[in-house]
Amino acid sequence: MPKSKCVPLKVTAHLVDGRFSSTDGIVMLDSILYHAWFIKHAPHVLEGVYKPEQIGYVGLPLVHLEDNRWAASKAVYQEIDKIVEHYNKRPDFFAGDKLDYLDMDKGIISDSVGLYRAYRNPQLIRTVKDGILTFYAVGKKDKIEELLSLMIGVGKKTAMGFGIVDRWDVEEIEEDYTTEHPKYGLMRPIEVEKADKTYDYPIMDYAIRPPYWKTINQRLCYVPVG
């Protein structure tokens, strides 16, 4: 079977109820595919069993750019609602530090202090028109479809039911919109010192490749929020 080639693609996520959880509103396609790669090739890492010798090169089916970046965009969508919801995080009463917070008179362990204290956490829930998130990429269509089939949701707190995907559509297009789009503007964080022009976007430390939470991947970037 001949190898598939990298082509410009439009990727559409159809959400079940149109809601997903994200603080800054940025959802990156390469981050989704990165997570899917580990589901397929290294599930033990997601289970907390990290063995460096079992992790080789993480090869996503995307064009590989300089600085180990991938040719993939953020999601674009029409936001129609935005609310703050809260979730409660239970304390771990069996944590080693809990005896330090035992009230000897009452015989009660405080759940509001300590490393594993209880939390009431806010999260920003966004609702998008028609439940559609659109991404752009340059990569191998069949391989991307294969990885996306493993991803049931996008954004944070999918276990709570946010960002659940009903289906993924991947289609070939003519142009590469992974960096800029004529309608939507900048399509991913771009390093300030490597940008070929000035952008009217906030400048902040932001990751340029997945995993986006990892400090080592952060650079001073133009970030297309809002």
Language-model-derived ranges and their functions:
Residues 1-226:
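RNA-interacting cores
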